[in-house]
């Protein structure tokens, strides 16, 4: 283990030395660029573009182009990127992750690789976690890019298709991750080329890359249409589930956050719903609703996993603490929570298009990211996204003091100690940022501070609209701010006058998050750019992480403590416990990684299918002459399948009447074909005969429509209508199959292998259905003028 660690550290140092040498080459142009007039500096952009056209590559151009962007930033923004920021920029240009501590100027760091890559004309996307940051960064950094002759656009949910198209056409575009994904899906549902907004996914720099590519990796982006109504079943399931008693009727596995009925619970369900066997295949819909109701009532917590606002259930992102607007839990869980909370149950939707962030961002030709905390997830970034994580040195040494964790026996004693510490810090004027994991905790702590008459503000999912303003004031003398995980990522907490002398910003964590990275983010709010500061976590043996993963050793430890000492406020400082906390976090991180990897393996099946359908669709949409080359092979394969199906065994057993019936249904008028015309022919001869009929029908349609453009429009209408209808049905069927395939693991079958093989068969069947339906629609439809989609 020690050897592996040594090799790691050594390879890191080697990589930093290489990057440092390249940054020195950028430095070497500093004086030369400083001597240029504004016009001469601006003229570098068209010069670089010409050199790229003449064959020079971006890597060769890097030292000079970075130096131009750097000098431009000094003149336009009044900011000159430090040497370490140049190093960060090199990491980004090379398609890797730059881990830079809070306050080290990630936004300015990105300007150099953004400018260099924008010169290629293929488009650079800067991805942020919310629209506020997109607008802010595009406004501030856009001044520099425009001054240097690059166009800048902002993409947003409220933009019209024309505005979006214009933004994507720019050299540089700022956008949220979700909007890029939804635009991709909408583009692949469009029926006209002119309705599409994107122009390929070339290079993206993802800000807060861990938040988007790790925390949100499992969240699929879904475009839905209306589905079938089942709200009564949710209400019935909810009423039943609320009658159950813990341990007797259901059991909860805290570690995996799952809940299931016991044998007693199953008997109660069979009696309640008047069934002989709850798990009979006929009762699949009911068991699905019961499973979701159990999760809603006994796993999902109000004000932690979701909030209820104006009669609507809204998801709270467990990593950021923000409300996820417009998102709904999938698989009917959202409806089950609506039934639990007694609000209106919105109908389940049918998925029409979906993609995960993992597969969306892997489609970029080059992907880079920056964050203050990626090191703990470096293996995942390497394995899934093929990105290395490089830790960039800070410009000034970190002066923050990270004090060791304090552990208390109970939640109550822990919060008493937290309030006491806040009071002491507040009395001397030192600003305090208190991090909580849940909305509920932030409100409980707020209540305790009110009792002590300590003025404070709360930042959680219920008031996130004031986020930037609250965070901006969190570094002033005497400020006390309670924040859930969101803690204003992307907004620096700047220290007010006199705060440095008081010791800087004090960060107090009220419990460890299941991810070490989130804890590090909270610590990183303090001590920016060499400022002083302190951080400390207050834990209790009743914290959720300890309950889920602490195990019997901790319980025994707690019992010994309580018998040895009746004082609830005793502070436990034990290496054993600190080690237990960290190993618990590593276990959760490992579980989460396995889960994300599992999601990716399943989603890769859909990715391959999605790419085939979207590629074929795009060929149809962009065709400008004729689609006969797409249509007639579909017709031929449909004919071959039908003839193969009815010509099994000896020739005397061939079902020629069925072939005639097929031809009448799909290709020709009833009087055009008889059994006699097929007698004595081989399979290939029958296929040729049918294809002759198909050619005749095709030419007739072409003649009826007079105009080649009308014929092309008719071909597009038929193909797209059929493909879209079958594809959305297929997505829905694959979704349902994926939910049920887990049960097959009990039959000694690997659920993933089962999903892959059956999914492939389902896809092949869908393609055959599309070709059959397209053939029938095209060949048998009556032509009317004014073809519309």
UniProtKB/Swiss-Prot annotation:
Subcellular location per the Swiss-Prot or TrEMBL entry: Cell membrane; Cytoplasm
Its EC number(s): 7.4.2.8
SUPFAM superfamilies noted in UniProt: Helical scaffold and wing domains of SecA, P-loop containing nucleoside triphosphate hydrolases, Pre-protein crosslinking domain of SecA
NCBIfam families given in the database record: PRK09200.1, PRK12904.1, secA
An example Gene Ontology CC term for this record: plasma membrane
Protein name (database record): Protein translocase subunit SecA
Major localization listed first in the record, in broad terms: membrane
Oligomeric form and interacting partners: Monomer and homodimer. Part of the essential Sec protein translocation apparatus which comprises SecA, SecYEG and auxiliary proteins SecDF. Other proteins may also be involved.
UniProt keyword terms in alphabetical order: ATP-binding, Cell membrane, Cytoplasm, Membrane, Nucleotide-binding, Protein transport, Translocase, Translocation, Transport
The keyword Cell membrane belongs to this UniProt entry's keyword annotation: yes
Coiled coil, from the record: none
GO term, biological process aspect, one: protein import
InterPro entries noted in UniProt: Helicase_ATP-bd, Helicase_C-like, P-loop_NTPase, SecA, SecA_CS, SecA_DEAD, SecA_motor_DEAD, SecA_preprotein_X-link_dom
UniProt: ATP binding residues: 85, 103-107, 492
């Amino acid at each position: 283990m020690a050897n592996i660690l040594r090799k790691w550290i050594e390879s890191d140092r080697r990589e930093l030395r290489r990057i440092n040498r390249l940054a020195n080459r950028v430095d070497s142009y500093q004086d030369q660029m400083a001597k240029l007039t504004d016009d001469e500096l601006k003229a570098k952009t068209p010069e670089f573009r010409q050199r790229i056209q003449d064959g020079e590559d971006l890597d060769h151009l890097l030292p000079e182009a970075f130096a131009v962007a750097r000098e431009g930033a000094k003149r336009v923004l009044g900011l000159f990127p430090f040497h370490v920021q140049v190093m960060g920029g090199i990491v980004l240009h090379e398609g890797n992750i730059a881990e830079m501590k809070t306050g080290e100027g990630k936004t300015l760091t990105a300007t150099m690789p953004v400018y260099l890559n924008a010169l290629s004309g293929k488009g650079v996307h800067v991805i942020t976690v919310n629209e506020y940051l997109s607008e802010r960064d595009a406004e501030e950094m856009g001044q520099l890019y425009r001054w240097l002759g690059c166009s800048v656009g902002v993409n947003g949910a409220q933009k019209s298709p024309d505005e979006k198209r214009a933004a994507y056409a720019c050299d540089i575009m700022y956008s949220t991750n979700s909007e890029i994904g939804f635009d991709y899906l909408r583009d692949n549902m469009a029926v006209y080329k002119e309705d599409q907004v994107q122009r390929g996914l070339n290079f993206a720099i993802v800000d807060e890359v861990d938040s988007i590519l790790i925390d949100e990796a499992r969240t699929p982006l879904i475009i839905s249409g209306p589905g079938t109504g089942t709200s009564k079943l949710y209400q019935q399931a909810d009423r039943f589930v609320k009658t159950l008693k813990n341990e007797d009727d259901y059991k909860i596995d805290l570690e995996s956050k799952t809940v299931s009925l016991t044998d007693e619970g199953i008997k109660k369900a069979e009696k309640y719903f008047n069934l002989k066997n709850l798990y009979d295949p006929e009762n699949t819909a009911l068991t699905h609703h019961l499973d979701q109701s159990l999760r809603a009532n006994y796993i999902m917590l109000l004000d932690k996993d979701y909030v209820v606002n104006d009669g609507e259930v809204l998801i709270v992102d467990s990593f950021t603490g923000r409300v996820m607007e417009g998102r709904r839990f999938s698989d009917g869980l959202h409806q089950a929570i609506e039934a639990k909370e007694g609000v209106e149950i919105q109908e389940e939707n049918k998925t029409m298009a979906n993609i995960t962030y993992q597969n969306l961002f892997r489609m970029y030709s080059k992907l880079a990211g920056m964050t203050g905390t990626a090191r703990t997830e470096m293996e995942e970034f390497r394995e899934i996204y093929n990105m290395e994580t490089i830790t960039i040195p800070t410009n000034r040494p970190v002066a923050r003091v990270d004090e060791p964790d304090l552990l208390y026996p109970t939640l109550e004693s822990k919060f008493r100690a937290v309030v006491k510490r806040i009071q002491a810090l507040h009395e001397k004027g030192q600003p305090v940022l208190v991090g909580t994991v849940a909305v509920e905790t932030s409100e409980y702590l707020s209540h305790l501070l009110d009792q002590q008459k300590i003025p404070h503000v709360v930042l959680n999912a219920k008031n996130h609209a004031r986020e930037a303003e609250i965070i901006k004031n969190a570094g002033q003398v005497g400020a006390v701010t309670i924040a859930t995980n969101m803690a204003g990522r992307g907004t620096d907490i700047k220290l007010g006058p006199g705060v440095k002398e008081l010791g800087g910003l004090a960060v107090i964590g009220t419990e460890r998050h299941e991810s070490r990275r989130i804890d590090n983010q909270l610590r990183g709010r303090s001590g920016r750019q060499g400022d002083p500061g302190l951080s400390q976590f207050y834990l209790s043996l009743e914290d959720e992480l300890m309950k889920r993963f602490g195990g019997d050793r901790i319980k025994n430890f707690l019992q010994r403590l309580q018998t040895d000492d009746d004082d609830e406020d005793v502070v436990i400082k034990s290496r054993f416990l600190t080690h237990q906390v960290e190993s618990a976090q590593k276990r959760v991180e490992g579980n989460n990684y396995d889960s994300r990897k599992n999601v990716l393996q399943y989603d890769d099946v859909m990715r391959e299918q999605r790419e085939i359908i979207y590629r074929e669709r795009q060929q149809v949409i962009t065709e400008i002459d004729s689609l006969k080359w797409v249509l007639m092979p579909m017709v031929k394969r449909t004919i071959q399948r039908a003839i193969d199906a009815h010509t099994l065994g000896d020739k005397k057993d061939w079902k020629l009447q069925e072939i005639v019936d097929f031809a009448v249904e799909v290709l020709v008028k009833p009087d055009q074909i008889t059994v006699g015309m097929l007698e004595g022919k081989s399979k290939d001869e029958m296929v040729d005969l049918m294809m002759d009929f198909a050619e005749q029908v095709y030419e007739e349609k072409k003649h009826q429509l007079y105009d080649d453009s009308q014929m092309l429009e008719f071909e597009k209408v038929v193909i797209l209508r059929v493909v879209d209808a079958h594809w959305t049905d297929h997505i829905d069927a694959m979704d349902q199959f994926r939910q049920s395939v887990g049960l097959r693991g009990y039959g000694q079958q690997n659920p993933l292998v089962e999903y892959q093989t059956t999914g492939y068969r389902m896809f092949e069947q869908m393609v055959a259905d599309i070709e059959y339906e397209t053939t029938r629609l095209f060949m048998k439809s009556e032509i009317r003028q004014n073809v519309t989609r």
